[in-house]
Amino acid sequence: MCKIITIANQKGGVGKTTTTFNFAAELAVRNNKVLLIDFDSQGNLTKNSGIAKGQNIDDMEMTIARVINTYINDCEEEPVIYKINERLDIIPCNIDMAKTKMKLNISIAREMYLKRILESLKNNYDYILIDTAPSLDVDLINAFVASDEVIITATPDAFSASGTKALFKTYMQTKKNFNKELSIAGVLITGVDVRTNFAKDMIQIIRSSWGEGIKVFNNVIPLSVKVKESQAVGKSIAEYDKNNKAAIAYSLFTDEYLKLK
């Protein structure tokens, strides 16, 4: 049975895209069939996946935005799925999503479009991971409505620790009104400079701020320049350097997540 997971935070720069790609890669090497949905008009997940191969992603036509437009216009085209490797696929996104979002905002049942699209795809996958924009608007609600679970990424800084209340409110409103089965799998702390006491203190603040009701994963993702290097060549950090500390951390996090099931 397919599990659909949204990776979310309304703040940018907290490791959403990096986590989505590397978590998907870890699930794939564990013999799972995984589909990535880039749902951010910046298209960073599309860039990181390596499918563009030098092409400007804003020139790509077969994106998630195109599919949503066909659903808005009652044509309902099947999405074009790009293969990253044998077990990992992606539906890309680019700047066209910004225009599509404007159409979504004035569409009937605007919250339901991504769910409708994924209904026809989920039987082909073990996991579908959705990378969202740093916002709290209609595309995030679409992702929540389509999902079974949410993983929240957070960095060990004051803004990240205090800035998730609005995200949690959006989650609760979506759960109440559209998707009663939606749950938060946990909070993953990323971008950790393990050398500093400040980071360690902020990790404790994040853990205590969520309380006992929301899991904060035991494994955290350390800072590593190798992560940006891996993104530049369209590889997961484990594929780029399996002994890197971030690669090991993403592997341990994936194991921790899977033990929850």
List each model region and its residues.
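P-loop NTP-binding core
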Residues: M1-K261
